[in-house]
Amino acid sequence: MRIVLQKVSSAQVSVGEKILGEIGVGFVLLVGIENTDGKEEVDYLARKISHLRVFADQNDKMNLSITDVKGSILSISQFTLYADTKKGNRPSFINAGDPEHAKTVYQAFNQALMNHNLKVATGEFGAHMEVKLENDGPVTIIFDTDHK
């Protein structure tokens, strides 16, 4: 699994004119899944993200987790995180998980985050979405279970 995490002040996702999810302070997660991903990757990333200390404490030091600040997560499926751009100018997505498998793993990941007592909003898997966010920091962290 590959995740791009951005710390935000607020964010929302919509399909067409319909807002599907929105949050205040928290994380936007762009979530990419490959065919070899499963429970081990889901559990590892849910645990890591739920305990990640990137919010400022009273001394302005990154020392608080999303749970500490009562933040929320906006989780967005993002198969393009597995783009291969080595050949030519058009990316290949052959390394991205097949849609059925990816959807199952994505749903399990969101549930694992909720099992860590996090509020999770989502977009629509496989849809063309518009994501609006206000970065805080900015803080952007990339997780890749192939490199843990």
Swiss-Prot record:
**One of this protein's Pfam families, by short name?**
Tyr_Deacylase
Please identify the protein, giving its name as recorded.
D-aminoacyl-tRNA deacylase
Q: Which domain of life is it from?
A: Bacteria
RNA-binding among keywords: yes
Enzyme Commission number, as recorded: 3.1.1.96
Gene Ontology cellular-component terms listed: cytoplasm
Tell where it localizes: Cytoplasm
Query: A Gene Ontology MF term for this entry?
Result: D-tyrosyl-tRNA(Tyr) deacylase activity
